[in-house]
């Protein structure tokens, strides 16, 4: 698991799979996980397996499944994903946002959060994420979601 701090209360990276990785998140003061993976991404046990592992580690868990390598699904899911991230942060959590590799979906959600919720210029949000970790946040998905009327949340 590769985990990178973006803000003191916001981390991004790849999916935790092992008990030690959930414990590492706790040692980094993470109190909540936002997973963008689908059941197919997780494999055996699916999202519920991760939810159980997070709970066993004492971490809150939220899931907004986003299909990997699907810009349209990412664009449609961004408003819901960002709203869930914002909700967790406003509750005082330190949040770990992850997808499978931590390269596209999770950095895109974090960049959109920085831009939409914190007012960071999109280019600056992207530059900041690139400085934090090797990743490819999807600026086109963010720009498309901003003007879309997609408001229906995905069901976990």
Language model features with spans:
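C-terminal domain-closing interface element
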Residues: 152-156
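Cysteine-based protein phosphatase catalytic domain of the PTP/DSP
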Residues: 7-94, 115-145
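A phosphate-binding catalytic loop at a beta-strand-loop-alpha-helix junction
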Residues: 92-111
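Short beta-strand/loop segment at the start of cytosolic alpha/beta domains
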Residues: 1-4
């Amino acid at each position: 698991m590769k985990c990178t701090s973006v803000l003191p209360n916001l981390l991004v990276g790849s999916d935790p799979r092992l008990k030690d990785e959930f414990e590492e998140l706790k040692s980094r003061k993470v109190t909540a996980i936002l997973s963008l993976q689908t059941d197919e991404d997780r494999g055996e046990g699916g999202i519920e397996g991760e939810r159980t592992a997070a709970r066993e580690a004492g971490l809150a868990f939220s899931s907004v499944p986003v299909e990997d390598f699907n810009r349209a699904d990412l664009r449609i899911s961004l408003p819901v994903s960002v709203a869930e991230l914002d909700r967790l942060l406003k509750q005082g959590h330190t949040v770990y946002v992850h997808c499978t590799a931590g390269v596209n979906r999770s950095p895109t959600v974090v960049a959109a959060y920085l831009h939409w919720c914190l007012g960071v210029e999109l280019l600056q949000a992207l530059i900041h994420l690139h400085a934090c970790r090797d990743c490819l946040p999807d600026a086109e998905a963010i720009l498309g979601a901003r003007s879309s009327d997609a408001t229906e949340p995905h069901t976990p």
